[in-house]
Regions:
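Short, Lys/Arg-enriched N-terminal segments with co-localized hydrophobic residues
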Residues: 12-23
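Rhodanese-like catalytic fold shared by cysteine-dependent sulfurtransferases
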Residues: 21-137, 159-200, 207-277
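Coiled-coil-like amphipathic alpha-helices with heptad-repeat character
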Residues: 2-5, 17-18
Length: 277
């Protein structure tokens, strides 16, 4: 009388595994900090070893001015790596102000692990600019709407043009750059420290607009603001009904773009299937 039971049990078990696999997520950490790392080349091997030991993939950049990158893995692995970066012996307290944004991915968004050595963690090609010494005023996501709604504030998107096409803030100027090192040319053509008294800048995770703020201050601009944590922090913090963001935020991994709540585009589309407008 139990002849049919094993077959039914196997079917239930198999479908349960498929459902579980679909629901498994990877934790993604976007991180950066401008910090003096004169020994950056010596940090590459132990950082690779640390990430590999916890099954982490992604890309991290090390330079004399700090660290930048995005990594992904299971939650325990990401948490262990972040703990070592911020409080462990490897960086000896030099990354205790690490800027972090966490999101999830329905599948591993990176194929491999890379730790690269660079002259700059974000390339501006302006050696006189030192964000470890001087940057603009950080603006929290909760205060961003009020700032960029001020008609006296010039809002600047510091990202490249293909990113801007996917989404940006209302009133934002598009520098139409192909790479960040072209941003100073945009400034010299478009902005004037004598006329443009207040500049508010933003980028994906905060690193480009932070370095851009240091550049503008060096060029004589007096009131320079930048979105702390970038667009990702804004989308994580601000509900859609209060948002001034238009479109999606491009990210440099296989998820391609994120929306409010840092939901990846494909997942958002799947969840909306069958809904009436």
């Amino acid at each position: 009388m139990f002849r049919g039971s094993p077959r039914h049990s196997r079917i239930f078990f198999s479908s349960d595994i498929v459902l579980l696999a679909r629901r498994m997520t990877h934790k993604v950490a976007a991180l950066y900090q401008f910090a003096a790392l004169p020994d950056f080349s010596d940090l590459r091997a132990p950082l690779l070893e640390l990430c590999a030991a916890h099954g982490i993939r992604g890309t991290l950049l090390l330079s004399p001015e700090g660290i930048n990158g995005t990594i992904a893995g299971l939650e325990d692995g990401i948490d262990a790596v972040i703990a070592e970066l911020t409080t462990g012996a490897l960086f000896a307290g030099r990354l205790n102000n690490l800027e972090l944004k966490f999101s999830t991915a329905s599948a591993m968004p990176f194929k491999r692990l890379k730790v690269r050595l660079k002259k700059e963690i974000v390339t501006l090609l302006q050696p006189q600019v030192d964000p470890t010494r001087q940057v603009g005023t950080y603006v929290a996501a909760e205060d961003w709407n009020a700032l960029i709604s001020d008609p006296d504030v010039i809002v600047v998107d510091t990202r490249n043009r293909f990113e801007v096409k996917m989404g940006t803030f209302e009133r934002a100027l598009d520098p139409e750059t192909r790479k960040f090192s072209q941003f100073p040319d945009f400034v010299s053509r478009t902005l004037n420290p004598d006329k443009n008294k207040k500049i508010a800048m933003f980028c994906t995770g905060g690193i480009r607009c932070e370095k851009a703020s240091a550049y503008l201050l060096a060029e004589g601009f007096a009131e320079v603001f930048h979105l702390k944590g970038g667009i990702l922090k804004y989308l994580e913090t601000i509900p859609p009904e209060q948002s001034l963001w238009q479109g999606e935020c491009f990210v440099f991994d296989e998820r391609v773009a994120l929306g409010h709540g840092l939901v990846e585009r494909a997942l958002a589309e799947d969840e909306s299937e069958g809904e009436t407008p």
